[in-house]
Amino acid sequence: MFRRVRRRSQGLIFTAVSRFDRQCGRADARRNARRLLDAAAELLAIDPLVSLEQVSARAKVSRTTLYHHFSSREALLDALTERSVSEVRAALESARTTEGAPDEAMRRALESTWQVVGRYRGLVLINPRRLGRDEVRRRLEPALAPLRLLIVRGQRSGAFDPELAPDWLLALLTDTIHAASAQVSSGAMDTTGAERALLRSAAALLSAP
């Protein structure tokens, strides 16, 4: 009987250790994936042609581990794009776009979005060429839904120009954000100056006559 109890206890311990090892393995995998994506975002902002080898070196992760997570450069860029879209969505949620005066809510939304764009400037440059502008807009569309609703709210209140279609205004805003990011990437403007220009341009685009 004692032998059976001991065997059962050993089995339970082995199962618990195996489960712990699997959990640690998953945690390590998630951590490595985050490090690789962080490194890719950082390096792409400096050099849009950065290689996978440079990404793995910056992340301090082996190339074997990198290829385990991302089979190609395109796979890495797609994963980074997906993460950037998720961060845009979170930024707009934190901006409380349904609260307060529409112009103030728009300022909060653009300031929050600009912080995300700053982290992914490399993607802003390469994705239109890599994916095409229509595909970039398609991927961003769900995340930008709060911004479109804010435009509609502003038009109904008289704060924004009601004569222009919300989708047109949203496209103009998106292009202006990308233009501001490109100015920073080229060195023509610093981040603060580009943000200031973005906010002034957006106010001029949206304001009712």
Task: Go through each PLM region and give its residues.
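C-terminal peripheral helix-coil segments that are non-catalytic and often amphipathic
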Residues: M1-F20, A145-S157, A182-P209
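Hydrophobic/aromatic-rich alpha-helical bundle segments in the mid-to-C-terminal region
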Residues: V124-R129, R137, E141, R156-S201
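Short hydrophobic/aromatic patch on the recognition helix
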Residues: K60-F70
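Hydrophobic alpha-helical connector segments
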Residues: A79, A90-R119, G132
